[in-house]
A protein has these predicted regions:
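Alpha-helical transmembrane segments
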Residues: 55-62, 175-189, 255-259, 366-382
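Transmembrane alpha-helix interface/packing and boundary motifs in multi-pass membrane proteins
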Residues: 14-23, 101-111, 142-151, 331-345, ...
Protein backbone atom coordinates (compact mmCIF):
# COMPACT_ATOMS: atom_id res chain seq x y z
CA UNK A 1 0.00 0.00 0.00
CA UNK A 2 2.92 2.36 0.81
CA UNK A 3 4.42 1.86 -2.64
CA UNK A 4 1.02 2.40 -4.28
CA UNK A 5 0.62 5.77 -2.53
CA UNK A 6 4.20 6.64 -3.44
CA UNK A 7 3.74 5.90 -7.16
CA UNK A 8 0.32 7.60 -7.38
CA UNK A 9 1.79 10.59 -5.53
CA UNK A 10 4.66 10.64 -8.03
CA UNK A 11 2.20 10.62 -10.95
CA UNK A 12 0.23 13.52 -9.45
CA UNK A 13 3.45 15.42 -8.73
CA UNK A 14 4.69 14.77 -12.30
CA UNK A 15 1.47 16.25 -13.70
CA UNK A 16 1.67 19.24 -11.33
CA UNK A 17 5.33 19.95 -12.14
CA UNK A 18 4.60 19.53 -15.84
CA UNK A 19 1.90 22.19 -15.65
CA UNK A 20 3.89 24.45 -13.33
CA UNK A 21 7.11 24.48 -15.37
CA UNK A 22 5.65 23.72 -18.80
CA UNK A 23 7.60 20.47 -19.15
CA UNK A 24 6.18 17.18 -20.39
CA UNK A 25 4.85 15.18 -17.41
CA UNK A 26 6.13 11.98 -19.03
CA UNK A 27 9.73 13.22 -18.85
CA UNK A 28 9.22 14.07 -15.17
CA UNK A 29 7.75 10.57 -14.83
CA UNK A 30 11.00 9.09 -16.17
CA UNK A 31 12.93 11.06 -13.53
CA UNK A 32 10.70 9.70 -10.75
CA UNK A 33 10.88 6.18 -12.21
CA UNK A 34 14.68 6.33 -12.00
CA UNK A 35 14.84 7.87 -8.52
CA UNK A 36 12.18 5.62 -6.97
CA UNK A 37 13.22 2.52 -8.90
CA UNK A 38 16.97 2.70 -8.29
CA UNK A 39 17.30 4.44 -4.93
CA UNK A 40 14.18 3.33 -3.05
CA UNK A 41 12.99 0.06 -4.59
CA UNK A 42 16.41 -1.31 -5.52
CA UNK A 43 15.99 -1.98 -9.24
CA UNK A 44 19.09 -1.94 -11.43
CA UNK A 45 19.26 0.50 -14.33
CA UNK A 46 19.05 -2.46 -16.73
CA UNK A 47 15.81 -3.53 -15.07
CA UNK A 48 14.43 0.01 -15.42
CA UNK A 49 15.42 0.17 -19.11
CA UNK A 50 13.64 -3.16 -19.64
CA UNK A 51 10.41 -1.57 -18.39
CA UNK A 52 10.36 1.02 -21.20
CA UNK A 53 7.18 0.23 -23.25
CA UNK A 54 8.87 -0.46 -26.60
CA UNK A 55 5.77 -1.86 -28.33
CA UNK A 56 3.64 1.07 -27.18
CA UNK A 57 6.29 3.50 -28.46
CA UNK A 58 6.44 1.78 -31.86
CA UNK A 59 2.64 1.67 -32.18
CA UNK A 60 2.20 5.39 -31.56
CA UNK A 61 5.11 6.36 -33.79
CA UNK A 62 4.23 3.96 -36.63
CA UNK A 63 0.56 4.89 -36.86
CA UNK A 64 1.21 8.64 -36.60
CA UNK A 65 4.06 8.45 -39.15
CA UNK A 66 1.86 6.90 -41.83
CA UNK A 67 -1.37 8.78 -41.23
CA UNK A 68 0.38 12.13 -40.89
CA UNK A 69 0.93 12.05 -44.65
CA UNK A 70 -2.86 12.37 -44.98
CA UNK A 71 -2.82 15.09 -42.34
CA UNK A 72 -0.02 17.06 -44.01
CA UNK A 73 -1.35 16.96 -47.59
CA UNK A 74 -4.90 17.94 -46.60
CA UNK A 75 -6.58 14.60 -47.32
CA UNK A 76 -8.15 14.38 -43.86
CA UNK A 77 -9.53 17.92 -43.98
CA UNK A 78 -11.20 17.38 -47.37
CA UNK A 79 -12.64 14.04 -46.20
CA UNK A 80 -14.21 15.88 -43.25
CA UNK A 81 -15.65 18.64 -45.45
CA UNK A 82 -17.14 16.10 -47.87
CA UNK A 83 -18.77 14.23 -44.99
CA UNK A 84 -20.30 17.41 -43.52
CA UNK A 85 -21.51 18.56 -46.94
CA UNK A 86 -23.35 15.24 -47.36
CA UNK A 87 -25.86 16.57 -44.80
CA UNK A 88 -26.79 19.64 -46.90
CA UNK A 89 -30.30 18.29 -47.53
CA UNK A 90 -30.71 16.92 -43.99
CA UNK A 91 -29.70 19.90 -41.87
CA UNK A 92 -31.48 18.72 -38.72
CA UNK A 93 -28.94 15.89 -38.63
CA UNK A 94 -25.98 18.24 -39.16
CA UNK A 95 -24.51 17.55 -35.67
CA UNK A 96 -23.99 13.98 -36.86
CA UNK A 97 -22.09 15.42 -39.81
CA UNK A 98 -19.74 17.10 -37.33
CA UNK A 99 -19.57 13.93 -35.21
CA UNK A 100 -18.70 11.60 -38.09
CA UNK A 101 -16.32 14.10 -39.69
CA UNK A 102 -14.41 14.44 -36.41
CA UNK A 103 -14.48 10.66 -35.92
CA UNK A 104 -13.24 9.93 -39.42
CA UNK A 105 -10.42 12.49 -39.33
CA UNK A 106 -9.40 11.27 -35.87
CA UNK A 107 -9.60 7.57 -36.77
CA UNK A 108 -7.59 8.06 -39.95
CA UNK A 109 -4.67 9.54 -38.07
CA UNK A 110 -5.65 13.12 -37.22
CA UNK A 111 -6.45 12.04 -33.66
CA UNK A 112 -8.18 14.45 -31.30
CA UNK A 113 -5.35 16.98 -31.74
CA UNK A 114 -6.02 17.24 -35.47
CA UNK A 115 -9.74 16.60 -35.79
CA UNK A 116 -11.03 18.97 -33.08
CA UNK A 117 -9.29 22.07 -34.52
CA UNK A 118 -10.31 21.19 -38.11
CA UNK A 119 -13.96 20.33 -37.45
CA UNK A 120 -14.36 22.50 -34.35
CA UNK A 121 -13.50 25.74 -36.13
CA UNK A 122 -15.97 25.00 -38.94
CA UNK A 123 -18.73 23.72 -36.64
CA UNK A 124 -18.55 26.52 -34.07
CA UNK A 125 -18.58 29.25 -36.68
CA UNK A 126 -21.64 27.68 -38.31
CA UNK A 127 -23.18 27.56 -34.81
CA UNK A 128 -22.37 31.21 -34.15
CA UNK A 129 -23.75 32.42 -37.50
CA UNK A 130 -26.99 30.46 -37.09
CA UNK A 131 -27.52 30.55 -33.30
CA UNK A 132 -27.17 26.77 -32.87
CA UNK A 133 -26.84 25.14 -29.44
CA UNK A 134 -23.09 25.04 -28.73
CA UNK A 135 -23.58 22.25 -26.19
CA UNK A 136 -24.71 19.91 -28.98
CA UNK A 137 -21.91 21.09 -31.27
CA UNK A 138 -19.22 20.66 -28.59
CA UNK A 139 -20.33 17.13 -27.75
CA UNK A 140 -20.55 16.20 -31.44
CA UNK A 141 -17.03 17.42 -32.22
CA UNK A 142 -15.14 16.29 -29.10
CA UNK A 143 -16.88 12.95 -28.54
CA UNK A 144 -16.69 12.24 -32.28
CA UNK A 145 -12.93 12.85 -32.22
CA UNK A 146 -12.53 10.61 -29.17
CA UNK A 147 -14.67 7.82 -30.62
CA UNK A 148 -12.78 7.88 -33.91
CA UNK A 149 -9.48 8.08 -32.08
CA UNK A 150 -10.00 4.69 -30.43
CA UNK A 151 -10.62 3.06 -33.82
CA UNK A 152 -8.30 0.03 -33.41
CA UNK A 153 -6.05 1.19 -36.26
CA UNK A 154 -6.15 4.85 -35.26
CA UNK A 155 -3.62 6.70 -33.07
CA UNK A 156 -5.42 6.34 -29.72
CA UNK A 157 -6.51 2.81 -30.66
CA UNK A 158 -2.85 1.94 -31.16
CA UNK A 159 -2.04 3.23 -27.67
CA UNK A 160 -4.93 1.27 -26.15
CA UNK A 161 -3.84 -1.94 -27.87
CA UNK A 162 -0.27 -1.39 -26.74
CA UNK A 163 -1.34 -0.83 -23.13
CA UNK A 164 -3.59 -3.90 -23.09
CA UNK A 165 -0.85 -5.98 -24.73
CA UNK A 166 1.37 -5.16 -21.74
CA UNK A 167 -1.13 -6.76 -19.33
CA UNK A 168 -2.06 -10.39 -18.79
CA UNK A 169 -4.77 -10.02 -21.45
CA UNK A 170 -2.48 -9.49 -24.45
CA UNK A 171 -4.37 -12.14 -26.43
CA UNK A 172 -7.58 -10.12 -25.97
CA UNK A 173 -6.07 -6.75 -26.95
CA UNK A 174 -7.74 -6.51 -30.35
CA UNK A 175 -11.11 -7.79 -29.09
CA UNK A 176 -11.13 -5.31 -26.21
CA UNK A 177 -10.07 -2.51 -28.57
CA UNK A 178 -12.99 -3.20 -30.91
CA UNK A 179 -15.49 -3.26 -28.04
CA UNK A 180 -14.08 0.01 -26.71
CA UNK A 181 -14.53 1.54 -30.15
CA UNK A 182 -18.12 0.30 -30.47
CA UNK A 183 -19.22 1.55 -27.04
CA UNK A 184 -17.31 4.84 -27.43
CA UNK A 185 -19.20 5.42 -30.68
CA UNK A 186 -22.69 4.30 -29.72
CA UNK A 187 -23.08 6.09 -26.40
CA UNK A 188 -22.28 9.63 -27.65
CA UNK A 189 -24.60 9.02 -30.61
CA UNK A 190 -27.39 8.31 -28.12
CA UNK A 191 -26.48 11.50 -26.23
CA UNK A 192 -26.70 13.52 -29.43
CA UNK A 193 -30.04 11.97 -30.36
CA UNK A 194 -31.43 12.87 -26.93
CA UNK A 195 -30.25 16.50 -27.13
CA UNK A 196 -31.24 16.95 -30.77
CA UNK A 197 -34.80 15.78 -30.23
CA UNK A 198 -35.07 18.07 -27.21
CA UNK A 199 -33.95 20.87 -29.56
CA UNK A 200 -36.05 19.71 -32.55
CA UNK A 201 -38.27 22.83 -32.51
CA UNK A 202 -35.23 25.02 -33.16
CA UNK A 203 -35.59 26.21 -36.76
CA UNK A 204 -32.04 27.58 -36.86
CA UNK A 205 -30.73 24.52 -38.71
CA UNK A 206 -32.95 25.40 -41.68
CA UNK A 207 -30.95 28.61 -42.18
CA UNK A 208 -27.57 26.88 -42.41
CA UNK A 209 -25.76 27.13 -45.74
CA UNK A 210 -22.90 24.72 -46.39
CA UNK A 211 -20.16 25.47 -48.91
CA UNK A 212 -19.26 22.75 -51.42
CA UNK A 213 -15.91 21.10 -50.55
CA UNK A 214 -12.88 21.01 -52.83
CA UNK A 215 -12.29 18.00 -55.08
CA UNK A 216 -9.53 15.53 -54.16
CA UNK A 217 -6.19 16.23 -55.83
CA UNK A 218 -4.12 13.36 -57.35
CA UNK A 219 -1.79 13.07 -54.31
CA UNK A 220 -4.80 13.00 -51.99
CA UNK A 221 -6.45 10.26 -54.04
CA UNK A 222 -3.24 8.22 -53.84
CA UNK A 223 -3.11 8.80 -50.09
CA UNK A 224 -6.72 7.67 -49.73
CA UNK A 225 -5.97 4.52 -51.75
CA UNK A 226 -2.93 3.70 -49.61
CA UNK A 227 -4.92 4.22 -46.41
CA UNK A 228 -7.65 1.88 -47.71
CA UNK A 229 -5.07 -0.81 -48.51
CA UNK A 230 -3.49 -0.45 -45.05
CA UNK A 231 -6.79 -0.78 -43.20
CA UNK A 232 -7.86 -3.62 -45.52
CA UNK A 233 -4.72 -5.65 -44.80
CA UNK A 234 -5.01 -5.08 -41.05
CA UNK A 235 -8.66 -6.22 -41.13
CA UNK A 236 -8.95 -8.93 -43.79
CA UNK A 237 -6.26 -11.40 -42.69
CA UNK A 238 -7.31 -11.53 -38.98
CA UNK A 239 -10.99 -11.86 -40.00
CA UNK A 240 -10.27 -14.75 -42.38
CA UNK A 241 -8.01 -16.39 -39.78
CA UNK A 242 -10.71 -16.15 -37.09
CA UNK A 243 -13.39 -17.39 -39.49
CA UNK A 244 -11.31 -20.43 -40.53
CA UNK A 245 -10.10 -21.15 -37.00
CA UNK A 246 -6.45 -20.89 -38.08
CA UNK A 247 -6.78 -23.84 -40.46
CA UNK A 248 -5.02 -22.03 -43.34
CA UNK A 249 -1.33 -21.84 -42.33
CA UNK A 250 -0.45 -19.09 -44.82
CA UNK A 251 -3.27 -16.81 -43.59
CA UNK A 252 -2.57 -17.66 -39.94
CA UNK A 253 1.12 -16.85 -40.38
CA UNK A 254 0.39 -13.44 -41.93
CA UNK A 255 -2.26 -12.67 -39.32
CA UNK A 256 0.16 -13.46 -36.48
CA UNK A 257 2.90 -11.35 -38.08
CA UNK A 258 0.81 -8.22 -38.56
CA UNK A 259 1.80 -5.47 -36.14
CA UNK A 260 0.02 -2.14 -36.21
CA UNK A 261 3.05 0.02 -35.43
CA UNK A 262 5.48 -1.77 -37.75
CA UNK A 263 2.97 -1.90 -40.60
CA UNK A 264 2.41 1.82 -40.10
CA UNK A 265 6.13 2.40 -40.60
CA UNK A 266 6.12 0.19 -43.73
CA UNK A 267 3.25 2.14 -45.29
CA UNK A 268 4.77 5.42 -44.10
CA UNK A 269 7.97 4.64 -46.01
CA UNK A 270 5.88 3.79 -49.11
CA UNK A 271 4.08 7.15 -48.78
CA UNK A 272 7.47 8.81 -48.32
CA UNK A 273 8.85 7.24 -51.53
CA UNK A 274 5.74 8.27 -53.48
CA UNK A 275 6.22 11.80 -52.12
CA UNK A 276 2.59 12.05 -51.00
CA UNK A 277 3.65 14.94 -48.75
CA UNK A 278 6.79 16.72 -47.60
CA UNK A 279 8.51 13.96 -45.61
CA UNK A 280 10.31 16.32 -43.25
CA UNK A 281 7.09 18.12 -42.37
CA UNK A 282 5.42 14.75 -41.78
CA UNK A 283 8.18 13.74 -39.36
CA UNK A 284 7.84 17.12 -37.64
CA UNK A 285 4.20 16.22 -36.95
CA UNK A 286 5.28 13.20 -34.89
CA UNK A 287 3.41 13.55 -31.56
CA UNK A 288 6.51 13.41 -29.40
CA UNK A 289 4.72 15.07 -26.48
CA UNK A 290 2.10 12.29 -26.52
CA UNK A 291 4.78 9.61 -26.88
CA UNK A 292 6.77 10.98 -23.95
CA UNK A 293 3.65 11.50 -21.82
CA UNK A 294 2.32 7.97 -22.38
CA UNK A 295 5.61 6.07 -22.32
CA UNK A 296 7.09 8.09 -19.44
CA UNK A 297 4.07 7.57 -17.19
CA UNK A 298 3.93 3.90 -18.28
CA UNK A 299 7.57 3.52 -17.21
CA UNK A 300 6.81 5.02 -13.80
CA UNK A 301 3.81 2.71 -13.40
CA UNK A 302 5.97 -0.20 -14.60
CA UNK A 303 8.35 0.46 -11.72
CA UNK A 304 5.38 0.37 -9.36
CA UNK A 305 4.14 -2.90 -10.88
CA UNK A 306 7.42 -4.51 -9.78
CA UNK A 307 6.44 -3.91 -6.15
CA UNK A 308 2.76 -4.85 -6.46
CA UNK A 309 0.93 -1.52 -6.80
CA UNK A 310 -1.60 -3.00 -9.24
CA UNK A 311 -2.60 -5.65 -6.71
CA UNK A 312 -2.85 -2.98 -3.98
CA UNK A 313 -5.03 -0.73 -6.15
CA UNK A 314 -7.24 -3.67 -7.17
CA UNK A 315 -7.59 -4.72 -3.53
CA UNK A 316 -8.64 -1.17 -2.62
CA UNK A 317 -11.26 -1.10 -5.40
CA UNK A 318 -12.56 -4.51 -4.30
CA UNK A 319 -13.89 -2.87 -1.10
CA UNK A 320 -16.46 -1.06 -3.26
CA UNK A 321 -19.79 -2.97 -3.38
CA UNK A 322 -19.52 -5.42 -6.29
CA UNK A 323 -22.50 -4.18 -8.37
CA UNK A 324 -21.24 -0.59 -8.57
CA UNK A 325 -17.54 -1.23 -9.22
CA UNK A 326 -17.82 -0.39 -12.97
CA UNK A 327 -19.68 2.87 -12.21
CA UNK A 328 -17.13 3.77 -9.53
CA UNK A 329 -14.27 3.16 -11.99
CA UNK A 330 -15.97 5.33 -14.64
CA UNK A 331 -16.59 8.22 -12.20
CA UNK A 332 -13.09 7.98 -10.71
CA UNK A 333 -11.49 8.10 -14.17
CA UNK A 334 -13.82 10.96 -15.13
CA UNK A 335 -12.76 13.02 -12.12
CA UNK A 336 -9.07 12.33 -12.78
CA UNK A 337 -9.46 13.20 -16.47
CA UNK A 338 -10.59 16.75 -15.67
CA UNK A 339 -6.96 17.72 -15.07
CA UNK A 340 -5.02 14.92 -16.82
CA UNK A 341 -4.91 12.90 -20.02
CA UNK A 342 -7.09 9.79 -20.29
CA UNK A 343 -4.74 8.04 -22.71
CA UNK A 344 -1.49 9.45 -21.33
CA UNK A 345 -2.08 9.00 -17.58
CA UNK A 346 -5.33 7.27 -16.62
CA UNK A 347 -5.25 4.35 -19.07
CA UNK A 348 -1.61 3.39 -18.27
CA UNK A 349 -2.42 3.43 -14.54
CA UNK A 350 -5.71 1.54 -14.58
CA UNK A 351 -5.09 -0.87 -17.47
CA UNK A 352 -2.22 -2.40 -15.50
CA UNK A 353 -4.75 -3.32 -12.79
CA UNK A 354 -7.01 -5.31 -15.15
CA UNK A 355 -5.57 -8.77 -14.29
CA UNK A 356 -5.68 -8.04 -10.55
CA UNK A 357 -9.18 -6.53 -10.79
CA UNK A 358 -10.39 -9.60 -12.63
CA UNK A 359 -8.84 -11.86 -10.00
CA UNK A 360 -10.25 -9.95 -7.00
CA UNK A 361 -13.67 -8.86 -8.31
CA UNK A 362 -14.49 -11.23 -11.17
CA UNK A 363 -15.54 -8.35 -13.41
CA UNK A 364 -14.79 -8.85 -17.09
CA UNK A 365 -11.59 -7.06 -18.20
CA UNK A 366 -13.52 -5.80 -21.23
CA UNK A 367 -16.17 -4.12 -19.04
CA UNK A 368 -13.46 -2.61 -16.84
CA UNK A 369 -11.48 -1.32 -19.84
CA UNK A 370 -14.62 0.22 -21.36
CA UNK A 371 -15.50 1.95 -18.09
CA UNK A 372 -11.97 3.33 -17.75
CA UNK A 373 -12.06 4.84 -21.24
CA UNK A 374 -15.63 6.16 -21.35
CA UNK A 375 -15.24 7.60 -17.85
CA UNK A 376 -12.02 9.35 -18.81
CA UNK A 377 -13.37 10.53 -22.15
CA UNK A 378 -16.50 11.96 -20.48
CA UNK A 379 -14.47 14.68 -18.75
CA UNK A 380 -12.20 15.37 -21.72
CA UNK A 381 -14.73 18.06 -22.69
CA UNK A 382 -13.69 20.31 -19.78
CA UNK A 383 -11.73 23.47 -20.65
CA UNK A 384 -8.81 22.06 -18.59
CA UNK A 385 -8.49 18.79 -20.54
CA UNK A 386 -7.44 17.92 -24.10
CA UNK A 387 -10.77 18.15 -25.92
CA UNK A 388 -12.22 21.24 -24.28
CA UNK A 389 -9.00 23.24 -24.42
CA UNK A 390 -8.50 22.36 -28.11
CA UNK A 391 -12.05 23.41 -28.93
CA UNK A 392 -11.63 26.72 -27.10
CA UNK A 393 -8.30 27.40 -28.78
CA UNK A 394 -9.54 26.60 -32.30
CA UNK A 395 -12.97 28.24 -32.04
CA UNK A 396 -11.89 31.67 -33.21
CA UNK A 397 -14.18 33.07 -30.49
CA UNK A 398 -13.10 36.17 -28.59
CA UNK A 399 -14.26 38.03 -25.49
CA UNK A 400 -17.81 37.22 -24.42
CA UNK A 401 -18.22 34.47 -27.03
CA UNK A 402 -15.16 32.65 -25.71
CA UNK A 403 -16.30 33.09 -22.08
CA UNK A 404 -19.75 31.71 -22.97
CA UNK A 405 -18.16 28.69 -24.67
CA UNK A 406 -15.93 28.15 -21.62
CA UNK A 407 -18.96 28.18 -19.30
CA UNK A 408 -20.91 25.90 -21.64
CA UNK A 409 -18.11 23.32 -21.63
CA UNK A 410 -17.60 23.47 -17.87
CA UNK A 411 -21.14 23.78 -16.53
CA UNK A 412 -23.44 22.37 -19.25
CA UNK A 413 -21.40 19.80 -21.16
CA UNK A 414 -19.16 18.21 -18.49
CA UNK A 415 -21.88 17.26 -15.94
CA UNK A 416 -24.00 15.86 -18.78
CA UNK A 417 -21.24 13.71 -20.31
CA UNK A 418 -19.88 12.46 -16.96
CA UNK A 419 -23.39 11.56 -15.78
CA UNK A 420 -24.10 9.83 -19.08
CA UNK A 421 -20.86 7.84 -18.82
CA UNK A 422 -21.88 6.67 -15.33
CA UNK A 423 -25.30 5.59 -16.64
CA UNK A 424 -23.61 3.77 -19.53
CA UNK A 425 -21.27 1.98 -17.12
CA UNK A 426 -24.24 0.99 -14.93
CA UNK A 427 -26.16 -0.28 -17.97
CA UNK A 428 -23.20 -2.36 -19.16
CA UNK A 429 -22.71 -3.83 -15.70
CA UNK A 430 -26.40 -4.79 -15.47
CA UNK A 431 -26.30 -6.41 -18.93
CA UNK A 432 -23.12 -8.28 -17.98
CA UNK A 433 -24.68 -9.50 -14.72
CA UNK A 434 -27.79 -10.98 -16.37
Amino acid sequence: MTYMLLIIGAIILAIFLGEKFDVNAGIVGVVFAYILGSFMIGLSTDEIFALWPVELFMMIFGVSFFFNFANENGTLEIIGHHLIYAFKNHLFWLPFGFFFAAALISGLGGSIWGSVPIVGFLALNIAKENNLDTRIIAIAVIEGALAGGVFPFGPLGAIVQGLIASTGFADMAQEISWQLFIVSTIYPILLLLFLMFKDRKNDAYKQVELKAPEAFKPKQKQTLTLMTIFIGIMLIFPIIDNFTGGSIPFIASISDSLNLGLMGIVFGVIAYMFELADGQKVLNRTPWSVIWMTCGISLLIGVGVQVGITESLAALISYVPWPIIPVTIALLCGCMSIFSSTIGVIAPLFFTTLPALYATTGWSPTIMAVCIIIGGFAATVTPFSDGGSLLLASSGYLGKDQKDLYNTLLFRVTPFTVGSAAITALTLSIIHSI
